Swiss-Prot record:
Its main location: secreted. One of its GO terms (cellular component) is extracellular region. Keywords: Glycoprotein, Secreted, Signal. Probably modulates blood feeding of sand flies on vertebrate species by binding and sequestering different mediators involved in the host response. Functions as a chemoattractant for host neutrophils; likely acts through a G-protein-coupled receptor and effect is dependent on calcium influx and phosphatidylinositol 3-kinases (PI3K) activity. (Microbial infection) Probably enhances infection caused by Leishmania species in the host through augmentation of host neutrophil recruitment into the skin. It comes from the Eukaryota. It is found in: Secreted. This is Yellow-related salivary protein M10. Exacerbates Leishmania infection in mice when co-injected with parasites and yellow-related salivary protein M35.
Length: 399
C-alpha cells in the first residue's frame, strides 16, 4: 500500500497544477540548422534565456559559449514551421539580421515595447580556452529592430570601466521604454537595468545619453548561507546575488516599480525607476516580503494584464505566482506548474499577447559544470497568464 501511495504521489508531482500549461518544446540535445555534425557537441548547447515575439511567432534564445565550438550564441525558432505537437525538439537557426557583427557570448535576449530585440554580449567565453577562438572584448549592449525587414541593428554601446569589471556576473536585465505609445522608430528615451550577481550590483544604461553607471545596495546581496540544488540524491551549493528583475506599470510620469530578487534569497524588493535614473547614492528599496521556504529563483516576469509576477524557481521544480495587489507572504503565493523534469528554471517572460513562457535548462550555477539526466532536461512551456492563475491565491476574484 505504501508503495502504491508513493507512486501516486510521484505521478501527481510530475503533472502541472494548471491544466492549460502546454509543453512547447523539449530537448535532450540541441542541433543547429546548416551546421555540419561533428563540428560541435550537442550536449554543450545550453540555452539560458528566451523571449517570444508575439507578432511573428518567433522564439529567440541566448546560447552562451559555456563550452568550445558553439556555432552561434543568438538563435531563433520560427514556431510557424515547427508544430510542437508534431516536432518536440526542433533545431535552432542562426539569428537573422542584416549587417550585424559576430557575437562572443549572449545569455539573454529581451524584446521591448517597441519590438526591439536587445541582447548583452558579455564579450567573454565562460571556459578556459586555447588560442583565439573567441577573442575577449568589452561587453556590448545591442538592439535590433524586429519591425524592419532583416532585423537591422539599430543601437550598440560598449560598456567600459567599473560597469564592465565582471561581465560573467551579468544576470537578467529589463528594458524600460519611457514612451512606447509615441514614435518608437526614433525613440531613444530608454533605460536598461542589468543585474550582476557577482558584484551584487545593478547597472543602469541611459540610451539617450549613452551613459552607464553602477548601483550597489545591501538588498542585492545573497542571503547568508548557500542555496542548495538537489539532483539524484546529491546536493550542490551556490551563492549568487541579484539576478532577476522585472518592471511594473508606469505612473503618470512614466516611472515604474522595478521588482528584483537575489538568486540565493526568497525575498523580493522593489524600487522606483525614478531613483535608478537619478544616480542616487542611497537607493532605499522596499522589502515586499518573503515567498516561502526553498523558493529561490533567478528569473521573474510581470504581467500587466493580471497584475501578477511569475517566478521560475531553481530547486523546487516549479513555477509560482504572486499578485502585487496582495501582501507578499507564503499563503499568497500560488504554484501554477510543477514537474519532476522541470529542472532549474532559467528564464521566464510574458509576451505582448499575455502568454507566459518559461524554460528550464538543468544548469544551475554550481561548480559541477554538467549534470547527467535520463530524460530531456531542456523544457520550454507556455500558458496564457489569465488561465495560469485560475483558482490560485494570485487570482484577484471579483466580490
Amino acid at each position: 500500500m505504501k508503495f502504491i501511495l508513493s507512486v501516486l504521489a510521484l505521478a501527481s508531482f510530475q503533472h502541472v497544477f494548471c491544466d492549460d500549461v502546454e509543453r512547447a518544446y523539449a530537448w535532450r540535445n540541441i542541433s543547429f540548422v546548416d551546421t555540419r555534425e561533428g563540428t560541435y557537441n550537442p550536449e554543450d548547447v545550453i540555452p539560458t534565456g528566451v523571449t517570444h515575439d508575439a507578432k511573428t511567432k518567433k522564439l529567440y534564445f541566448g546560447v552562451p559559449r559555456l563550452y568550445p565550438n558553439i556555432p552561434y550564441t543568438l538563435a531563433e525558432i520560427d514556431t510557424n514551421k515547427y508544430n510542437s505537437s508534431e516536432i518536440r525538439s526542433p533545431p535552432f537557426s542562426k539569428f537573422n539580421s542584416q549587417g550585424g557583427k559576430e557575437f562572443t557570448s549572449i545569455y539573454q535576449p529581451v524584446i521591448d515595447d517597441c519590438r526591439r530585440l536587445w541582447v548583452l554580449d558579455v564579450g567573454e567565453a565562460d571556459y578556459k580556452k586555447n588560442g583565439n577562438e573567441y577573442p575577449t572584448k568589452n561587453p556590448e549592449i545591442i538592439a535590433f529592430d524586429l519591425n524592419q525587414e532583416g532585423n537591422p541593428e539599430v543601437h550598440r554601446y560598449k560598456l567600459e570601466g567599473d560597469v564592465a569589471k565582471t561581465p560573467l556576473g551579468f544576470g537578467g536585465f529589463a528594458v524600460d521604454v519611457l514612451n512606447p505609445n509615441g514614435n518608437c522608430a526614433t525613440s531613444d528615451e530608454t533605460y536598461l537595468y542589468i543585474t550582476n550577481f557577482i558584484d551584487n550590483a545593478l547597472i543602469v544604461y541611459d540610451m539617450k545619453n549613452r551613459n552607464a553607471w553602477k548601483i550597489n545596495d545591501d538588498s542585492f546581496k545573497p542571503e547568508p548561507g548557500k542555496s542548495v540544488f538537489n539532483h539524484k540524491g546529491e546536493e550542490y551549493t551556490y551563492s549568487v546575488g541579484i539576478f532577476g528583475i522585472t518592471l511594473g506599470d508606469r505612473d503618470k510620469d512614466g516611472h515604474r516599480l522595478a521588482y528584483y530578487l537575489a538568486g540565493s534569497s526568497t525575498k523580493v524588493y522593489n524600487v522606483n525607476t525614478a531613483n535608478l535614473k537619478k544616480k542616487v547614492k542611497s537607493l532605499k528599496p522596499t522589502l515586499l516580503g518573503e515567498r516561502g521556504y526553498k523558493t529561490e529563483a533567478i528569473a521573474l516576469a510581470y504581467d500587466p494584464k493580471t497584475k501578477v509576477i511569475f517566478f521560475a524557481e531553481s530547486d523546487s521544480r516549479q513555477v509560482s505566482c504572486w499578485n502585487i495587489q496582495k501582501d507578499l507572504k507564503p499563503e499568497n503565493v500560488g504554484v501554477i506548474y510543477t514537474n519532476a523534469y522541470f529542472v532549474f528554471g532559467t528564464d521566464i517572460m510574458v509576451d505582448a499577447d499575455s502568454t507566459l513562457w518559461f524554460m528550464s535548462n538543468a544548469h544551475p550555477p554550481t561548480k559541477i559544470p554538467k549534470l547527467e539526466f535520463d530524460k530531456r532536461q531542456i523544457r520550454l512551456m507556455k500558458v496564457p497568464t489569465h488561465r495560469a492563475i485560475r483558482n490560485l491565491p494570485c487570482e484577484m476574484r471579483k466580490a
